[in-house]
Amino acid sequence: MKFSELWLREWVNPAIDSDALANQITMAGLEVDGVEPVAGSFNGVVVGEVVECAQHPNADKLRVTKVNVGGERLLDIVCGAPNCRQGLKVAVATIGAILPGDFKIKAAKLRGEPSEGMLCSFSELGISDDHSGIIELPADAPLGTDIREYLKLDDNTIEISVTPNRADCLGIIGVARDVAVLNKAPLQEPEMAPVTATISDTLPITVEAADACPRYLGRVVKGINVNAPTPLWMKEKLRRCGIRSIDAVVDVTNYVLLELGQPMHAFDKDRIDGGIVVRMAKEGETVVLLDGSEATLNADTLVIADHHKALGIAGIFGGEHSGVNGETQNVLLECAYFNPLSITGRARRHGLHTDASHRYERGVDPALQYKAIERATRLLLDICGGDAGPIIDVSNEATLPKRATITLRRSKLDRLIGHHIADEQVSDILRRLGCEVTEGQDEWKAVAPTWRFDMEIEEDLVEEVARVYGYNNIPDEPIQAGLIMGTHREADLSLKRVKTMLNDKGYQEVITYSFVDPKVQQLIHPGAEALLLPNPISVEMSAMRLSLWSGLLATVVYNQNRQQNRVRIFETGLRFVPDTQANLGIRQDLMLAGVICGNRYDEHWNLAKETVDFYDLKGDLEAVLDLTGKLGDIQFKAEMNPALHPGQSAAIYLKDERIGFIGVVHPELERKLDLNGRTLVFELEWNKLADRIVPQAREISRFPANRRDIAVVVAENVPAADILSECKKVGVNQVVGVNLFDVYRGKGVAEGYKSLAISLILQDTNRTLEEEEIAATVAKCVEALKERFQASLRD
């Protein structure tokens, strides 16, 4: 936002220079991007009047003038400006004047005619780039007055970056409030007395979308002269804010926008059919905007309409059909409060970004509309004449924003600032900010002002107190760096160690958004309830993820579309599961997930092209699980997951608790997500694995180990892991190793059965095992398998 320093000082005038003012504004949180003078460096330029203006005898495009600058005689000046004419008040650079660029004015002859000065344009004085003609001053400009003094050119343009939370500073009044608070100076608001209605004319106004438009004010002003010139003082203020003067009506609404931060619009009343209706657009409805472009609207766009058609996009852009033109005599002034959510994103959808939409998207003061429409009415009547009717007010108090009541605790204030500010100072700061303050025992209750809708929680008040008190006034404290023993335990398994192992196995870490497409998430987790964002970045990022698979699979598709068919990626991050028992109704679980697809190895002349399968991913996952020391307690059990292939997937259990899933992506899901070929995924709840089992040293047996192999026939649906687990349990004191080394199906084994060849390693730490003991242990294992799984020894 750009504004004139002198305009700001009309509202509040602290006894500090421009540099100090700019620094103060920056320290207050409104970063100053630049301070530039409004005009170039010049002197010797005064107000003059063209008394005579005749054609140059030797040049078609030059005029010979006699100019009165308040001296003893008239000056002869040759001028080539097309708008030079008799009776015009102008800016005259007299002999001896120095203009920007160190250009000195001297007496000269132009095509044989003497010239004792120069009639100046805005560009020649370094005021603007306008060189279309000489400056035209008001008829009452006093002759001989220094032009710098008359136009108040000893001024600066200050440009600031306004953060989204400080929308109240998108008007002079907001910046002035902050400067007044920081300097304990009075805020001198211009007189904005109500304008008495002199006519009774009104217009029917209906608000059908009260949630989107809680307040809409209108006022009829009749008999205006739309061609009346905008006063030079207003043009200059607008120019110094970067706004070009258009016509008196538009200039007035722009002036109020810059002064109060309240967007306004003026309709040609005679072009409104029936009355004003504030409603949501009809799907596909069109409106021709003031710039001549046609916008096709969606049903979620708020429009200002009459009884037959849309007149403009509410809070963004007016329509051409109802706009003010050179023949307008009667206008309807509009001043409204629109809910920011009803405006946000609509302008960008149509490739627009206007001063109005910029403010409405961030929010305007919901109590400002009366002041703004009275201010605009008075300015319009003073410039264009006419008669004003009464204000038409259509408000819905139930949908207007309510002022926040916030409790500020002394303990919280001192802890966050790190410095004690006296109670009296805290109360004074809050009141100067516009809050209604009630002091309590070590606390304050503050009702935020209507223009500070960013004040919502206790931390906001702490920030405001520190900002106004002055960060530079908070004393530096030496850092307390006492020696603190680390909390790391040997049993802690860091994610960094896990990530390093996955990196060593060829995986690359990715970070995806926690916001995902709800449609894609429903494909992966059908029927699952997700947390939906009330104000998402986009529709495709409007749900919080229930797992990391949504982002990982989207990343795989992205890479496959760029000819990267061999992908190995992993991610660690939070998933967000709605849970009424959790804090704030949402459970956040730290997850570890990975995806692989494509060939097992990079292309190589000595390696066959083999596509990855379930056991490739399972092997990598078991290597990770082995870091926890809990691999022996891990089981892979057949369990349905709608996102995974029913025959090539498993649930992962730690003892009796499920901690994740692994498997091939379901073919139907693979098709819907446009995945190219077999894709395998896994996901683990990491918090259930983060504590590793620390290896315990034990005595190495000095006695020989004995191996015995058995082959048992079991039903096809019996997991081999259960067989191995049972063998370990039965021979707990002597069986030190169990391994599955062969699986056989075929001749000699009945249909629906399989043969598992298992090696048993038996050993004792205190003695050599006798053959009878070994045989008894093996027989015990076989008997246990027979009893539990109906296993039989294979012949």
From Swiss-Prot:
Keyword Nucleotide-binding: yes
Main location: cytoplasm
Start and end residues of each tRNA-binding domain: 39-148
UniProt GO cellular component terms: phenylalanine-tRNA ligase complex
Top-level EC class: ligase
Cofactor: Mg(2+)
SMART domains per UniProt: B3_4, B5, FDX-ACB
GO molecular function, one term: ATP binding
Pfam families, A to Z: B3_4, B5, FDX-ACB, tRNA_bind, tRNA_synthFbeta
Domain spans labelled B5: 401-476
Localization: Cytoplasm
BP GO annotations: phenylalanyl-tRNA aminoacylation
Domain annotation FDX-ACB: ranges: 701-794
Reactions accelerated catalytically: tRNA(Phe) + L-phenylalanine + ATP = L-phenylalanyl-tRNA(Phe) + AMP + diphosphate + H(+)
UniProt keywords, alphabetically: Aminoacyl-tRNA synthetase, ATP-binding, Cytoplasm, Ligase, Magnesium, Metal-binding, Nucleotide-binding, Protein biosynthesis, RNA-binding, tRNA-binding
Protein EC: 6.1.1.20
Similarity section: Belongs to the phenylalanyl-tRNA synthetase beta subunit family. Type 1 subfamily.
Subunit record text: Tetramer of two alpha and two beta subunits.
Protein name as annotated: Phenylalanine--tRNA ligase beta subunit
Source organism per UniProt: Salmonella typhimurium (strain LT2 / SGSC1412 / ATCC 700720)
Taxonomic lineage of the native organism: Bacteria, Pseudomonadati, Pseudomonadota, Gammaproteobacteria, Enterobacterales
Gene for this chain: pheT
